Amino acid sequence: MGYRETYESWLNNPYFDEATRAELQAIAGNEKEMEERFYMDLEFGTAGLRGVIGAGTNRMNIYTVRKATQGLANYICKVGAQAKGVAIAYDSRHMSPEFADEAALCLAANGIKAYVFESLRPTPELSYAVRKLGCTAGINITASHNPPEYNGYKVYWEDGAQITPPHDTGIMDEVRNVTDYASVKTMPLEKAKADGLYQTIGADIDDPYIAELKKLVLHQDCIDKVASELKIVYTPLHGTGNLPVRRVLKELGFTNVYVVPEQELPDGDFPTVSYPNPEAAEAFALGLALGKKVDADLILATDPDADRLGVYVKDAQTGEYHSLTGNMSGCLIGDYVIGQRKELFGLPEDGAFIRSIVSTNMADAIAAYYGIDLIEVLTGFKFIGQKILEFEETGKGTYLFGMEESYGCLPGTYARDKDAVAASMMLCEAAAYYKTKNMTLWDAMLAMYERYGYYKDDVTSITLKGIEGLAKIQEIMNTLRENAPAEIGGYKVTAVRDYKLDTITNTAAGAVRPTGLPKSNVLYYEMTDGAWVCVRPSGTEPKVKFYLGVKGTSLADADAKSEALSKAVHALIDTMM
């Protein structure tokens, strides 16, 4: 069926509600809009669903959410796991509570109990809830840091991590097999509750989740000594982090926490920012203003679903605030956690620091310094979660810390997704620890550069929307795959990792070996002097991302090298546009 026929079927089928049909009636005659909304089903990929909210098969709406949930329910029943139920959380976005209930009622109609949070909660708490409740799966309604018009649907498995093989492909196949939207099961909320298939959760998960975070604290003595002297500015960017971040900091004894008032309350419009992303400087405008006003030591921002943390720290010498990238904050927290664990308890022989392939090589230097394993995984925190599960199942490997360059880390194993609530807590604890040594977090960062090397990493991306954009993204990857650059920015390419073909090719010797990781459409160029470039299509946005890293002899040298390599990458992009 073509897009026009699908459009007509939605427009005329009484199964679809009046508001949906009115929205579709309003685009009658607009061929481009009709095609964009109906040329495909919103793809249920390895990250679940993510798309613009609206009527149509290629949009986020109650019908696409029901379809995805019916596919998930079919898979759960297929593997005989329906007795354990599914936990459901949601963020502050438009339609998030409605989508959560639609998912719950579809599960209930399939005989699967849904545990639904009473109000918005952070992503990592959903991961924790799946484990705590012993659920088969979890659903999180969120589009993370995407613009306001987006929403999404992420699926977790029983270990609390987002779905990985074989469950991801199994669920994707079942979702694809649901072709008739009107055949999807649902039931009234009151009946689901009466039948014991819809249960509200809240404080019964919040309290043990916060307790698990507090178990991670290594130096309560330092917090007790100097917490009253530390000034912390925090913004939840209109999202889910407000209550849990403030709660855990307060319970530990941090009394000077200033919340950005304009961004404190949940709001799906994200009215103070165009893009609620803690990677973006714009997201910190209000936080920085408040930070300067109260003379804050550090400024924290969590994204709407509170799994990623952005940070600015004060330089006591100049009074300026420095932005920490996800690589910098991840290494700062990781070095603190691993270093203090070694000092207090010693490190296990099989201890491991896990990072994604696009994260900084400083992590490798930290692991080498402490004599622990550095393990690389594909991009996506689910692969870090998968590694923790592997450690538990084999009895080989002890998880110490995991991080991604995209501002996410996990300092414990209570959950299996990145946790900005825990990261905020650990960073504040680290600030207290270093303060007892007369150091700031910026001083600690400079000391890490001295110890491990001056690593500088960056990422740039090109956005290519719609049908044409999808084709262009594939064209770019094909061009690079067929014509690998011999050098980029003066750095000679010494090896090419093609994760789609599962090959690492030494460019000088021509020797080929496997990557050892699952296949993925990613190209990675190892280069001279420790430089590297990695190219991959985003799994959640219509973008191609270009990551790069260098190592310098000083901060200034690393900055200059990074800037030069970034220019070379942009020049490479220009040749393909």
Model regions and ranges:
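Short Gly/Thr/Asp-enriched flexible loops that form oxyanion-binding sites at enzyme active sites
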Residues: 99-107, 150-157, 307-327, 363-366
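N-terminal small/polar loop signature for handling phosphorylated ligands or for N-terminal nucleophile
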Residues: 87-150, 253-310
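Phosphate-binding and adjacent anionic-ligand microenvironments
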Residues: 292, 296-298, 320-322, 340-536, ...
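Short glycine-rich or small-residue beta-strand-to-loop segments that form or flank ligand, phosphate
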Residues: 85-91, 231-234, 410, 549
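Conserved phosphate/anionic-ligand binding catalytic regions in large, soluble enzymes, centered on
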Residues: 38-58, 143-146, 232, 236-248, ...
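Glycine-rich phosphate-binding loop plus the immediately following alpha-helix
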Residues: 156-186, 327-350, 355-363, 420
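Gly/Ser/Thr-enriched, mixed-charge loops and adjacent short helices
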Residues: 33-38, 42, 151-285, 289-290
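An N-terminal, well-structured beta->alpha segment
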Residues: 5-103, 192-229, 240
